[in-house]
Amino acid sequence: CEELDGVAGVVTDPDELRGLAVLESDELCDLFPGETVVWPPGRDEGDGPAWMVRRSSVMPDDESDDRSAWSISRRVLLADHNAAVAARAGTLADGIGIEPKPAAALSEAGAWHDVGKNDARFQRLLWRGDPAGRKALAKSGGRSTPLGAVRRARADAGLPTGWRHELASAAAYWEQAESDGVGQEFRDLVTRLVGTSHGHGRPLFDHDPVTAGPDHADALEELVGEGEWESLIARTDRQWGPWGTAYLEALLRAADCTISMEGK
């Protein structure tokens, strides 16, 4: 049956579904590398889903049907990953013919989108131990870790429930851009692209500065403590239009996903 092409698995166990339903999209990507997760259409977020389908991102008749190329089996350095995403974002922008200013913002956002992973707790999670003296990672390798083990490892590393590395990344850029005297229009757009790179933050982040920290505390206080994040979302919507910002966000996400799928 053509409708079953690429189906990697179906989950119907209520307990397992409840555990999976609370995960963020990037956590599901880590749990099921090379696969797309499909939930029941129109499901109520307040109710547990009835099923979940795991569909292979690479269809069996795809020319690139090499599953090993779609999963991470080795560690990826943070600096290398950010550089690769920045370059890919620039390539996409150039190929589409985007104007120079938003194209430059896309590349800059790619270079900063995962900087928040420098958080010592997150590095402890990725290294599965003390990261002291080691280069920062973007990907830990060995992504077949069971769901329960992933959640325990996050807690053991000291990460608060719901902590978002992309908000820390946005704060890091906001802080540096202010120091460098970057113009507000460009600074706003890059910060927005970085902060929304996993689909959150439109228009709010469910964080207070303490939970979002501890790094870049002043920037986080300004962004989520004083409401500057909501203001820059409104400013970028006015400047670039809601569809324009959504388009740029999608391009950055495409750059990140394709690089990750290539194991970079």
Regions inferred by a protein language model and the residue ranges of each:
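Divalent metal-dependent catalytic cores for phosphoryl transfer on phosphate-bearing substrates
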Residues: A69, R75, G97-K264
